[in-house]
């Protein structure tokens, strides 16, 4: 979360699930919906979690104690990518991409994005 704050990132794109076929693929680095978690000097509140066909969108409120700032960050997580394979169709991934582009335009097209 420090990198998100330092780079003033407003959008995170994630293409993996935390677990696939019973194996851990990614560390869950965010709090559950409607919960707050502190990571070092950064407080993260998961304000909203919306499920779409093939992906999730989360809206976080981030507070940095060092930077004395508060910002809204969006995370898009594609959940239909099978382990060691490719999706059967790209329609959900293309749809998520459109949402990401729209989000970037709404918050300012020059905002950094982490993929």
UniProtKB/Swiss-Prot annotation:
Q: What PANTHER family does the entry give?
A: PROTEIN-TYROSINE-PHOSPHATASE, RECEPTOR-TYPE TYROSINE-PROTEIN PHOSPHATASE
Top-level taxonomic group:
Eukaryota
Q: What does the similarity note say?
A: Belongs to the protein-tyrosine phosphatase family.
Using the UniProt record, name the top-level EC class of this enzyme in a single word.
hydrolase
* Ranges of residues in domain Tyrosine-protein phosphatase: 1-115
The reaction(s) annotated as catalysed by this protein in its Swiss-Prot or TrEMBL entry are: O-phospho-L-tyrosyl-[protein] + H2O = L-tyrosyl-[protein] + phosphate
Q: Please identify the protein, giving its name as recorded.
A: Tyrosine-protein phosphatase 23
What species does this protein belong to?
Styela plicata
* Entry-linked InterPro entries: Prot-tyrosine_phosphatase-like, Protein-Tyr_Phosphatase, PTP_cat
Ligand binding (substrate): 83
Q: What is its EC number?
A: 3.1.3.48
Alphabetical keyword list: Hydrolase, Protein phosphatase
Upper classification of the organism: Eukaryota, Metazoa, Chordata, Tunicata, Ascidiacea
């Amino acid at each position: 979360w420090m990198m998100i704050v330092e780079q003033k990132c407003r959008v995170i794109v994630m293409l993996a699930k935390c677990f696939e076929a019973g194996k851990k693929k990614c560390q869950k680095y965010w709090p559950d919906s409607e919960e707050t978690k502190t990571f070092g000097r950064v407080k993260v509140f998961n304000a909203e979690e919306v499920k779409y066909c093939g992906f999730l969108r989360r809206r976080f409120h981030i507070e940095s104690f060092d930077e004395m700032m508060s910002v809204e960050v969006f995370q898009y997580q594609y959940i239909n990518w099978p382990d060691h394979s490719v999706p059967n169709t790209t329609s959900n991934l293309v749809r998520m991409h459109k949402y990401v582009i729209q989000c970037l335009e709404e918050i300012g097209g020059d905002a950094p994005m982490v993929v």
